[in-house]
Amino acid sequence: MGLLARLTGAAFATTATPALGWMWYTRATTFVPFPTSSPDFSSATARKFNPGNNPPVCNDMAVRTVPLDQLKTTDQETLTRQFCQGIWSGPGFEIQRRYLARKYRQLGGRWDHLWEKADLKSSRYNVGTKIADHFEVVERTDEKVCLINAGNKSSGLIEIRLLYDAATLH
C-alpha cells in the first residue's frame, strides 16, 4: 500500500505541478481565436511560406493587457524587442532551449544561433536571427516579429506582435 500511495502522489505531483505553473504563468493572459479572415494570412510573408494557401491548423492569439504605467518606454520598436527578449529568455522557453542546446549545439553550422539566455535577452531579433536551432526570424517590423521553424520552413509561421494602445475607448 505504501508503494501505491507513493506512486499516486508522484503521478499527482508530476501532473498538477506543471498545470498549476501554467495557470499561474498565464493568469493575466486571455486566449482568443484568431480569425482566418485576418490580413496576416495574405501577407507577403504568409504567401511566401504558404504558397498553397493551406488553412491554418492552429491559430489562436494570446492577449495580455499591461497598464501603461508599468511600461518603461512607449517606443513601439523597443517594446516589441523587449517582448521578444522576455519570451525567448524567459522560463517558458528554458526547458526547450536547454534540450535543443544539448541535442544540436555541437553540430556544425550552428555557431551563429542564439543559445544562451543572456544572448536571447540582448538580441534585437532582426531578420535572419536563429534561435536554438529551431526558430528563424523571417520578418521584422516595429510592431511584430515573424518566425518559422528553422528546420521545416513549411511548418507554419509564429507571429509575435505588440500592439501599443494608449487609449482604449468603450
Kindly give the residue locations of the regions a language model identified.
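Residues in well-ordered beta-strands of folded domains
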Residues: 65, 138, 148, 161
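Beta-strand/loop substructures that line and gate deep hydrophobic ligand-binding cavities in soluble
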Residues: 151-170
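Terminal signal-anchor or tail-anchor transmembrane helices
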Residues: 2-30
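Generic detector of intrinsically disordered, low-complexity, polar/charged segments
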Residues: 6, 18, 83, 105-106, ...
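Hydrophobic ligand-binding cavity/cleft-lining segments
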Residues: 23-122
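Mature, function-bearing regions of proteins
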Residues: 74-76, 110-120, 125-145, 151-154
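Short, ordered beta-strand-loop transition motifs
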Residues: 54-57, 137-143, 163-168
